[in-house]
UniProtKB/Swiss-Prot annotation:
Record's GO cellular component terms: cytosol
Gene that encodes the chain: tmk
Name the UniProt record assigns to this protein: Thymidylate kinase
Top-level taxon of the source organism: Bacteria
Organism whose genome encodes this protein: Pseudomonas fluorescens (strain ATCC BAA-477 / NRRL B-23932 / Pf-5)
GO biological process: dTDP biosynthetic process; dTTP biosynthetic process; dUDP biosynthetic process
Binding site for ATP: G10, P11, E12, G13, A14, G15, K16, S17
Higher taxonomy: Bacteria, Pseudomonadati, Pseudomonadota, Gammaproteobacteria, Pseudomonadales
Length: 210
């Protein structure tokens, strides 16, 4: 039996974590096994790599170093958490995955998309998400929400120009493959966002039940 791999993507402050929990509740209420996880992270080792990636330090991290750390964490995450869950038929809801790598390290840092694609193939093989929800909102709104949460991490400290590139990359990827991506207006009040998610539930349940 093969599970269902759903990723939640979007810039800072888009509400991915909150809505991931909401989707999980709705799916579990229908009797579906759901695994909640996140990137970078998802395993003890990958969470340690996450800390390195997100914690601001005096030494400037080279962009290639950042990219390789992201994929190192992903390799561990896939091997020990995501693939086993999918193999037993679970629905995996992952807060960020490789689309974020294309957006942040590709568009934001200006790294080669071909290099990212090569690492994607090496680490993931043929595994790609079955569905990706892109939570979109204006950059200034997202950064204001992130700031309201408290201390900013290393990525959240980037400026508006960086996050505009990130947003545009997410939108471009969603437009290029509408069969896999669903765009969600995350600038709406939370109740309206969750109404949008409710409208997706019938097809998610059908796919999860095979």
């Amino acid at each position: 039996m093969t599970g269902l791999f759903i990723t939640l993507e979007g810039p800072e402050g888009a509400g991915k974590s909150t809505n991931r929990e909401y989707l999980a509740e709705r799916l579990r209420a229908a009797g579906i096994e759901v695994l909640l996880t996140r990137e970078p992270g998802g395993t003890p080792l990958a969470e340690r790599i996450r800390d390195v990636l997100l914690t601001p330090v005096e030494e400037v991290m080279n962009a290639d170093t950042e990219l390789l750390l992201v994929f190192a964490a992903r390799a561990q995450h896939l091997a020990t958490v995501i693939r086993p869950a999918l193999e037993r038929g679970a629905v995996v809801l992952c807060d960020r995955f490789t689309d974020s790598t294309y957006a942040y390290q590709g568009a934001g840092r200006g790294l080669s998309l071909a290099r990212i694609a090569a690492l994607e193939d090496f680490v993931q093989g043929e595994l790609r998400p079955d569905l990706t929800l892109v939570f979109d909102l204006p950059v200034d709104v997202g950064l204001a929400r992130a700031s309201a949460r408290g201390r900013l991490d290393r990525f959240e400290q980037e400026g508006q120009a960086f996050f505009q590139k990130v947003r545009e990359a997410f939108l471009a990827r969603a437009a290029a493959a509408p069969q896999r991506y669903v765009l969600v207006d995350a600038a709406q009040p939370l109740a309206q966002v969750q109404q949008s998610l409710d409208s997706l539930l019938p097809q998610l349940l059908e796919r999860a039940r095979g």
